[in-house]
Design a protein with these regions (language model features):
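Alpha-helical transmembrane segments of multipass membrane proteins
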Residues: 60, 64, 96, 157-162, ...
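Membrane-interfacial helix-loop connectors
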Residues: 69, 80-82, 93-151, 321-406, ...
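Transmembrane helical segments that form the transport core of multi-pass membrane transport proteins
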Residues: 76, 205, 210-364
Length: 434
């Protein structure tokens, strides 16, 4: 036996044996944690992959193929006007009702296209944090003070975090953007800006309305939109198809076949609209992979993002589910520990709320009922705001993917800035309104 050559395989084998030997199977909390991890993964796959992640992957792929890199550099690059760059990045979340994981393909798309780290991280934070529906729900259920504080804090946070990231990594980012500019010196705008704008608006419309949540009150505008969500989504899909035929040389007969398949699914299974949506995604993928060079490049880019992000997200969801469980359920960490640690308005309570929020996974809009339960269990208002500001923008799955895009150092800095600023905001809010 060659110890130098075989010590690593031997170590892995020994480690695996020890883990298997001492595996706490039969301990109720461990068994429950395994089930919670699998339940959360199932819930994530059913509620977020088809309608959230896959459309986001297609948008990210389109950004890298169809969006002019010079346009990205002009509006979001390191040398862009700060007012424009951070203004666009910080309020983008008011349009996108996405969670911390769905925003990742979009962030990866603009970052790789040459967006400066400041505007890119401002968008990364604001995407899930500045959600109009979530802010309205926060004000309605948790109180107007928390709702306003969340809205103002999220906008300010995104700008400040972006500026600090630019300040810390500005020199290295200049080298990256110069390299990007050099590789795109012959970049030409193939289509007018208004065509590109309408094209992306149609895809964003599909993403927004396919994920429109059911409101608590069965009346009013939000409920009307919810009752028509799939009709509206279908309208945006038809609009996208017409633009692809007119401007992107996609064959009309291929899109008509996909449309017939989707319509048949919707008519045959009216109570399961997700099946029709899935049929549309599959058909659309076939259209792209059998189309011209531009269409194939779009799908290749989309698939590239999926290969990078999917495994890390699923692994992160499993770990988060095992440690913390689903909302209303427990994993390895008892919920009593969490609720007892966030009472009052001490520095430690706010810090713990920020860290716990950063590692927990919140699906879109779920943070409000979770916080409602924690406030009822004695959580202070300061820690509640800290969790609201840190939670939706970060999660364990989200962190794993960000590291693969930006690197370890930038990811740790981004997470630290979010946690520290959320903690400070929580302390200040608790002192004023606690």
């Amino acid at each position: 036996m060659d110890w130098k050559k075989d010590r690593n395989p031997l170590g892995y084998m020994l480690g695996f044996f020890l883990v298997a030997y001492f595996l706490p199977v039969g301990w109720n909390r461990f068994d429950n944690a395994v089930f919670e991890a699998l339940f959360l993964l199932k819930e994530y796959a059913r509620e977020h992959v088809l309608t959230c992640l896959l459309p986001a992957f297609f948008i990210a792929g389109a950004i890298s193929v169809f969006l002019s890199q010079s346009s990205v550099m002009k509006y979001l690059g390191a040398q862009a006007k700060k007012v424009i760059a951070y203004g666009v990045a910080s309020v983008s979340g008011s349009i996108l009702a996405v969670c911390s994981c769905t925003v990742l393909p979009l962030f990866a798309g603009i970052y790789r296209m040459g967006a400066g780290i400041g505007p890119a991280t401002a968008f990364l934070y604001s995407g899930p944090a500045i959600n109009v529906l979530a802010i309205i729900l926060t004000a309605r259920i948790l109180g107007l003070q928390l709702g306003i504080a969340r809205a103002v804090g999220a906008v300010v946070f995104s700008i400040v975090i972006g500026l600090l990231m630019h300040l810390i990594y500005g020199k290295k980012e200049n080298e990256r953007t110069i390299s990007t500019q050099a590789s795109t010196i012959n970049d030409e705008v193939a289509r007018p800006l208004w065509q590109t704008t309408l094209y992306f608006a149609s895809m964003v419309g599909i993403l927004i309305f396919a994920n429109w949540g059911k409101p608590d009150v069965a009346s009013g505008l939000w409920n009307l939109i919810y009752s028509w969500k799939w009709i509206i989504t279908g309208g945006f899909s038809i609009l996208l198809g017409l633009m692809l035929t007119a401007w992107f040389d996609v064959k009309l007969w291929k899109l008509l076949i996909v449309g017939i398949a989707v319509t048949a699914s919707a008519v045959t299974l009216p109570d399961h609209p997700v099946i029709a949506f899935a049929a549309g995604l599959i058909g659309f993928s076939v259209v792209l992979t059998t189309g011209n060079r531009e269409s194939r490049s779009w799908f290749d880019s989309t698939f590239g993002f999926a290969k990078q992000i999917f495994p890390l997200l699923f692994a992160g969801v499993l770990i988060a589910g095992a440690l913390l469980g689903r909302p209303g359920n427990e994993g390895l960490i008892p919920s009593e520990w969490v609720s007892s640690a966030v009472g009052g308005n001490s520095i430690m309570a706010n810090l713990f709320a920020s860290i716990a929020g950063a590692f927990m996974y919140f699906a879109t809009l779920t943070e409000v009922p979770i916080l409602q339960g924690l406030l009822g269990a004695g959580m202070g208002k300061g820690p509640a705001l800290a969790l609201l500001l840190a939670g939706p923008a970060l999660s364990l799955p989200n962190m794993l993917v960000i590291r693969s895009i930006m690197g370890t150092s930038r990811t740790i800095t981004f997470i630290s800035l979010v946690v520290v600023m959320a903690t400070i905001s929580g302390i200040a809010f608790g002192l004023i309104y606690g």
